[in-house]
């Protein structure tokens, strides 16, 4: 099993490392074997090297299905103008949107990544407060299937394409029939699931502890039966925020027609739901041992690299039975 940390490939973020050796020394000090990288710009100094890249996280947009379907009325309501739409998606048409995903897949291939991750999810700012949905799970899954098939049909990629669960509309790993439907309809043969434990815990607002979260994950694995064998990787973290969500949805803010202001205000709300904290309860060992993933990425939030290293070592210690 590869133990990994997530990293952002972008000049300003990578500026904290003088050399590639510094970055490698950092993730080794965390007890990890390599990186899951998301490309958010250029890496002009080539700090991230193919030797350290095990996985790549593909570009993602939280709210993209209406853009994909060309629903101009919804885009106008949510973003206010074509100019803001252009700023959000860095394009104004399907072909250029598709090109962004293909470019990330090409990058994953060039870097020798063993896997690439795709978010099968959609949520607007308003939905993130109300939990009242504009799309069904199947609508989001169908849009994702269409995009992925366009990107991969006829391509000669060698990486595993891993589909990640979230708690919004789309793939949540809570409905085995939808999980099977999604896997059946994606043409790419070398496919599987990236199970995000914190996201799965977010899907059940009744959870009040890490242990209850682990029990819920086991229950979802039970319900998925043989489909669980498609889990090739895990994003490991915990989130116990159900009580917050149950209170927050009682009094959602009104729709704000200033998109960038509403996005900034929603950011803290989302981080309060999806906390990306390290597991400290030994119950998580049973989850990881049961799944036995090939790739385990410690996807943890932290204020700086030192804290991230501390949290990663802590979660590794829990996995190793030292806590």
Regions from the language model: what does each represent?
Residues 90-192:
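Active-site acidic/histidine proton-transfer and metal-coordination neighborhood
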Residues 20-28, 43-46, 105, 148-152, ...:
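Short amphipathic alpha-helical segments and helix-helix/interface helices
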Residues 12-19, 31-47, 61-66, 95, ...:
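Acidic-and-aromatic substrate-binding clefts and catalytic sites of carbohydrate-active enzymes
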Residues 2-8, 25, 87, 98-104, ...:
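Histidine-acidic metal/acid-base catalytic patches
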Residues 1-103, 320-323:
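N-terminal pre-domain/capping segments
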Residues 65-76, 134-138, 249-256:
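Aromatic- and acidic-residue-enriched segments that line the glycan-binding/catalytic groove
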Residues 6-12, 37-40, 56-63, 118-120, ...:
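A cross-domain feature marking catalytic cores of carbohydrate-active enzymes
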Residues 31-32, 51, 158, 190, ...:
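A generic structural signal for alpha->beta connector loops
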């Amino acid at each position: 099993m590869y133990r990994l940390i997530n990293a952002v490939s972008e000049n300003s973020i990578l500026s904290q490392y003088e050399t590639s050796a510094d970055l490698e020394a950092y993730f080794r000090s965390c007890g990890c074997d390599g990186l899951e990288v998301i490309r958010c710009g250029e890496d002009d100094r080539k700090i991230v090297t193919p030797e350290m890249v095990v996985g790549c996280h593909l570009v993602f947009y939280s709210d993209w299905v209406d853009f994909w379907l060309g629903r101009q009325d919804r885009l106008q309501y949510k973003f206010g103008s074509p100019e803001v739409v252009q700023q959000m998606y860095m394009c104004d048409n399907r072909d250029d949107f598709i090109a962004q995903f293909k470019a990330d897949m090409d990058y994953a291939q060039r870097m020798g990544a063993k896997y690439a991750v795709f978010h099968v999810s959609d949520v607007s700012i308003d939905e993130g407060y109300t939990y009242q949905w504009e799309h069904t799970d199947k609508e989001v899954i169908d849009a994702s299937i269409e995009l992925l098939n366009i990107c991969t049909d006829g391509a000669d990629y060698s990486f595993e394409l891993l589909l990640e669960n979230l708690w919004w509309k789309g793939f949540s790993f809570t409905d085995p029939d939808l999980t099977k439907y999604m896997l059946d309809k994606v043409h790419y043969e070398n496919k599987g699931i990236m199970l995000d434990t914190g996201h799965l815990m977010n899907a059940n607002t009744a959870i009040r502890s890490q242990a209850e979260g682990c029990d819920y994950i086991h229950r979802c694995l039970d319900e998925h039966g043989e489909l669980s064998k498609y889990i090739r990787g895990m994003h490991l973290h915990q989130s116990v925020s159900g009580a917050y969500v149950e209170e927050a949805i009682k009094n959602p803010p009104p729709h704000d027609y200033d998109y960038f202001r509403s996005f900034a205000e929603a950011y803290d709300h989302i981080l309060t739901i999806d906390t990306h904290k390290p597991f400290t309860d030994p119950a998580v060992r049973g989850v990881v041992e049961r799944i036995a993933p090939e790739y385990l990425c410690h996807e943890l939030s932290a204020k700086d690299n030192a804290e991230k290293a501390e949290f990663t070592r802590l979660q590794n210690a829990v996995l190793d039975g030292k806590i």
